């Protein structure tokens, strides 16, 4: 499954709050995407990655990330 990652946070609540802000700021770009917060443990640090998708192909995900980056928002294509 192809998704984009929009940030990583120390608290799940911060990831969810970030989605609300990003969705408001980039309504047209994120309108058809579903958020997902994924918990990961890196060394002894727990992080929560804010991801959105799914995308049917990597080209669409790359295009959206380029648009997000042009608007000074973080974006990384994952799952390809």
Model-derived regions: residue spans:
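Short structural boundary motif marking the start of a folded domain
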Residues: 1-2
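Extracytoplasmic
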Residues: 10-80
């Amino acid at each position: 499954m192809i998704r984009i990652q929009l940030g990583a946070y120390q608290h799940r609540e911060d990831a969810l709050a970030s989605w609300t802000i990003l969705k408001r700021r980039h309504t047209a770009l994120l309108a058809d995407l579903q958020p997902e917060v994924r918990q990961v443990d890196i060394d002894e640090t727990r992080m929560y990655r804010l991801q959105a998708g799914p995308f049917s192909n990597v080209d669409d995900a790359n295009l959206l990330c380029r648009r997000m980056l042009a608007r000074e928002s973080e974006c990384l294509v994952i799952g390809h």
